[in-house]
Amino acid sequence: MTTLTRQDLNFGQVVADILCEFLEVAVHLILYVREVYPIGIFQKRKKYNVPVQMSCHPELNRYIQDTLHCVKPLIEKNDVEKVVVVILDKEHHPVERFVFEIAQPPLLSISSDSLLSHVEQLLRAFILKISVCDAVLDNNPPGCTFTLLVHTREAATRNMEKIQVIKDFPWILADEQDVHMQEPRLIPLKTMTSDILKMQLYVEERAQKST
């Protein structure tokens, strides 16, 4: 078994690649399942050996890709605590927050290629859970939109400023109303633990969604 520290960036990049690829699929699937956009803009694809729905809308896809492209260097440095998909009503108040809590161990234990295969199996379980999450959530009001939030560790601020200059992608401090909901209903969806990554997904759902 090989043990690497967080400073071994080559493997840190592998972890970031795996996670960002997963998050891209997960965001698309959340938008489809929660009917944020018309189903006509989605096409069925196969990811992690299961069917998923991916958007064909260029601007939407670019927003998701650009966000994750800028998040990737922060994940490499273990500076990301949460990635959140916030679904907003017409008044731009959050009705649902899909929260991906991310933790990486300071030492990465790599035993074999089977580890990555195991991680893929764990991520597949997340995708399957997202695909049926509407069974435990109330319907959202019509006309919803969404935004992506990234919760970082305090030390990440300088890195974000550098990335903003390099990538020409503006980071904006989130509005307080996007970050918090009053007394939301908490719905745990899935948790995974592996030698390279720990992650849990839960939904914060507003008690009254009707507008």
UniProtKB/Swiss-Prot annotation:
The keyword Phosphoprotein does not apply. Pfam families: HORMA (PF02301). Keywords: Cell cycle, Cell division, Cytoplasm, Cytoskeleton, DNA damage, Mitosis, Nucleus, Transcription, Transcription regulation. The keyword Cell cycle applies. It is found in: Nucleus; Cytoplasm, Cytoskeleton, Spindle; Cytoplasm. Residues 13-203 form the HORMA domain. Gene3D superfamilies: HORMA domain. Transmembrane segments: none annotated. GO terms for cellular component: cytoplasm; nucleus; spindle; zeta DNA polymerase complex. InterPro entries: HORMA_dom, HORMA_dom_sf, Mad2-like. One of its GO terms (biological process) is cell division. Adapter protein able to interact with different proteins and involved in different biological processes. Mediates the interaction between the error-prone DNA polymerase zeta catalytic subunit rev3l and the inserter polymerase rev1, thereby mediating the second polymerase switching in translesion DNA synthesis. Translesion DNA synthesis releases the replication blockade of replicative polymerases, stalled in presence of DNA lesions. May also play a role in signal transduction in response to DNA damage. Homooligomer. Interacts with rev1. Interacts with rev3l. Interacts with fzr1 (in complex with the anaphase promoting complex APC). May interact with cdc20. This is Mitotic spindle assembly checkpoint protein MAD2B. It comes from Xenopus tropicalis (Western clawed frog). The gene is mad2l2.
